[in-house]
Amino acid sequence: TGLSIGVHLLNLLCIPAIVLVFYYKKFPDANLKGSLIALLISVVLVAAVLYGVVPGIITVGGWFELFFTNTLGMPFNTGTILYILLLIGSFVWAIYETYQDGSQKRQNIAFIVAFGLIGIPFVGFGWKAFFTGIVILAVTFFVLQMKRKSNVDGKKSVLPLVSARIKNTALLSMLMLIIGYSSYALIVIRSTANTPMDQNSPEDIFTLGSYLSRDQYGDSPLLYGQAYSSQPAIDEDGQHYKFSKGAPVYERKEKASSDEKDSYFVVRTKDKIQYEQNMFFPRMWDNAHAGQYEQWLGGVTGHDVDGVKMPTQMENIRYFLSYQCNFMYWRYFMWNFAGRQNDIQGNGEPEHGLSLIHI
């Protein structure tokens, strides 16, 4: 999983299959309930890696970089280098403590330090991410401190709720993620050479964050958001569109003289425009492709929402199934396993570019 982060994030989809294999091997009498629980655990693991480790290391590393550069006036990348050293050192300490299985207090403190430095608890940006992370770390420490009663062969004892073995396994797993994550160092090294293809120019912790979050491709609403016909919300002053404030984007400040200290400044924030009309699971959301949406569905009847014709949820789902699932997924899938109809570029026609058994 760690190395897969540096290859392609879609490799994370192997986690549910691996969890199920482990579950079926560990529990021969597996049932539907256990399988669903295993799948739920796998979803949590994928989310922890995708929304925790991947952006979390950038978040915490960015805090270190800003503090040492903007506050203490030290050169660029000083905070990043120190953060990497502390991250590695914290994992070495935590793995050693859990392997020795000595003081429970030292084990738990070392685990919390490593867990915090890898950035999983710090979801979001700014002070919100900081306080959210503190709460998650506090809850995690409380759980690690909990005890359970044990009765083996008539001998009663009190043991930690989370054993040293479990903590050690978790730390080793996170360490493997870090080792895989380190493959992105090649991107930074390549960018410093100023190659012709240098998207986002990831030469520091902040531009690397933009590269990893794929800012150059934009984003789209997933579970809830606007449709292609939605109108922007107007601010209270009646003069501007309404925006939701996003994370700040830092860039290196150009020096006016060689005596000036290195520093970062906020060049912009990742604000998102808000819309008056929204819907659940919006698949037809881009107003630049309104004509293509209606052409694919053979026309959109829609329904009126505040004077705006919005696609119905049924039309939205029909587009999702017919285009995104059938045409854009199953067609390519069956190219690999059944063969191509022909090599002519298809745009939805029944005689161009489908698979041999396409419906």
Describe the role of every protein-language-model region:
Residues 1-18, 24-29, 167, 287, ...:
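Membrane-integral, polyisoprenol-dependent glycosyltransferases
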Residues 168, 172-342:
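Aromatic-rich transmembrane-lumenal/periplasmic boundary elements in polytopic membrane proteins
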Residues 20-29, 92-101, 142-151:
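Structural signal for the C-terminal ends of transmembrane alpha-helices
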Residues 357-359:
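Conserved small/polar residues in nucleotide/adenosyl-binding loops
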Residues 1-6, 115-124:
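Membrane-interface alpha helices of multi-pass inner-membrane proteins
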